[in-house]
Structures are given as structure tokens and as C-alpha cells.
UniProtKB/Swiss-Prot annotation:
Sites where the protein binds Mg(2+): 18, 56, 117
Homology family: Belongs to the dethiobiotin synthetase family.
Chain positions recorded as substrate binding sites: 43
Record: active site: 39
Record-level GO BP terms: biotin biosynthetic process
Name of the protein this chain belongs to: ATP-dependent dethiobiotin synthetase BioD
The protein's enzyme class: ligase
SUPFAM superfamilies, per the entry: P-loop containing nucleoside triphosphate hydrolases
Cofactor: Mg(2+)
Pathway assignment: Cofactor biosynthesis; biotin biosynthesis; biotin from 7,8-diaminononanoate: step 1/2
Binding, ATP: 56, 117-120, 177-178
Protein's job: Catalyzes a mechanistically unusual reaction, the ATP-dependent insertion of CO2 between the N7 and N8 nitrogen atoms of 7,8-diaminopelargonic acid (DAPA, also called 7,8-diammoniononanoate) to form a ureido ring.
Amino acid sequence: MQPPAFYVTGTDTGIGKTMGSTALLHALRARGHTAVGMKPVASGCERTPQGWRNEDALALQAASNPQPAYATLNPYALPAPLAPELAAADVGVTLSLEPITQAFAQLRAQAEVVVVEGVGGWAAPLSATLDQADLVRALQLPVVLVVGVRLGCINHARLTAAAIAADGLQCIGWIANEVDPQMERVEENIGMLRQRLAMPCWGRIPWRPDAEAAAQAQGLQLPR
């Protein structure tokens, strides 16, 4: 059964969590659902007349229907492109769960499904006292893992899946996102991932860097 919200994490930073998240939003919308994205913490923002804005969070906003207010979608917009703990310290901000849980509740009231995108890889902390696992527990979310398909991805995927399970949380699916156009034997690597990951594969996003998120969504097969 389709969960009303889930948390998207990745095998590392830069492996396409946002691509996976926006594709999920479009796939959900194609099924007739209202679906909105959320980026609780984003580091690496640009100053605009409307305030600090993050490229990934804006992509989630554009892929959402209805489109939520930016401050609700991205409660913590941190200027420096650093680990959240460092980026928050640079501007004297202490990250806490309450603003995130309040924003999440607002998004849940606006749409049938909320796609929450995490930061970096699973073990990347949010603050000195807050891990992503703490946030996922607070929001009571299952996890979807985006696997960046490149050399080393089998090790990274298995380690990430094991870490999620060790935190007592449920990973309900994974997405293969091709990030290296030079990688050899992609099909075999994805086949090995299918054999070794306990959760089902929700589809594959091919290497098409200029493709729109709606087109990338065509490679996904979400559970009913």
C-alpha cells in the first residue's frame, strides 16, 4: 500500500536524491495523487529578493502539486554549502525537530503524499545531537533509498541498508539512479543489487542529465 509520506535518503551525497524525489513526486501525481516535496534542511543557498533559496528545494517545490510555500517546504535554508552542522553554526542557528515537525504537519494537511528528502548519505548528521534517524523517527516515516549507480554502489547500498535497519527503521524500496555514463556493466550491477537488497526496487532512472523530472518518472514502478 502506498504510504502517505516517506523519507528519501541516498548512498552518498551527489547521487541524485533530488532527481529521485522529484521523479517520485511526478510518478505519484501521474497516479492521481496530490503530492508535495519537503527538504527539511538545505545547505548551499543563494540570496534572492524572497530570501535564501536552495536549488534542490526549488526543484521539489516545482514538482509538487499543490505547490507549498517555500518556508514550509524548507524550514532550514542555510547559506554555506557545508555539512548542515557546520552551515548552521556559521549563521548561529541550532537545528531542532520542532520547526520541521510543524512544517511537515502543514504539508500533510495539503496533500495526500509528502516526499521528504534528506541530506547527504544516511549517516550524515543534522547537528551535534540530531541524526537523520532521529528525524525519521519523529515523523514516523518509512525510508526509500536512492542508489547512485557507479563503481562501489553495491558496497554503499548494502552498508546504507544495514545502517537503516540497525537504527530500527524500515526501508521499503530503492531506486537505481545512473550517475556515471562511463560505468561498465550497469545491468549486471543493478542485478546484483536486486539480489542483495531485501527491499523491492522501485525502478531505474537512466543517465539523462537534461531530462525533465516528469520524464525520469517513467522509469519508476511504485507499489500500489
